[in-house]
Amino acid sequence: MLTGLGGAFCYLCNYSKEQCNTFDYVKAGFPVDRSLEQTKQICEEKWHLLENRKPNDYKVRQGVTKEPITNEEHLTLHPLHSYLRVFGWIYKICYHAVAGHFNWSESKFEGISKIQGVNNLIESKRKIQKCVEEEINVALEKPDPTGHGGTSTTGNVVKTLLNTNNRTLLTKHISDVSLKENIDKIILYVSIIFWPVNSNSKINVEKYSVLCQKTMMLVMSVKWIRFTPYCSCK
C-alpha cells in the first residue's frame, strides 16, 4: 500500500525517506502517528490513482497507491517478519562491503562495467554463504530445500546468525578493518534490539531508546548504507 512513485518511507509514521536518514530527525525519534483514517482520506481525494500521481508528491499522497483493505488499525510488528526483513538488510550491507562496492545501488558502479560489478556482488554473496556453511553447516540464501518456494534463510537460521557469536561470520571477508568493526557493531546492536521483542521481561525503555538511536547513528556514519522501509519500521 505504501510503495510506488514518491512513496512513503514508513507505514507507521509520516516521515519521508530523506528525513529518516537525517541526523536531527533520528535523534528526535519517530512517533507512531500514521492512522488508517489519514490513509482513507487520501483515497477519498483520489491522490492514490495513477493518473493523479506526480513525482515528489509525498506531502499529498504519502505513498498511498491503493485503498486500504482493512477497517482496523494495525500498529504491531510481527517478530519473525522483522527478523527476516532486517536480516536481508544486514546481508546486503555485508556482501557490498566484501565486494568493496560502497554504494547502496546495485546498478551503479564506479570504474568497472555493470556486468563486472554485478558479478563481484554475486561472488561476495558466495563467499559469505560458503563461510557460514563451512563453519556452522547452515545454508544461507539458497533455494528452499523443502520445495515450498522461498529460500533456506528461515527464522531459525537468522536467529542462529544474529543471536550468537556466529554473526561475525557475515563480516569475516571484509578486508577494511575499520569498516568491519563498524558493521560488526551494527549487527550486534540490531541483535540486542530484537532480543526483548519475544520476551515477557521488563526493560528500561529509556535505555532501549538510546540504544536504538545509537544504532541509527552508527549506521549513518557509514555513508553508503541506506535505511530501507522495512528496517526503518522494524
Per-segment meaning from a language model:
Residues M1-K234:
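A structural signal for the principal folded core domain
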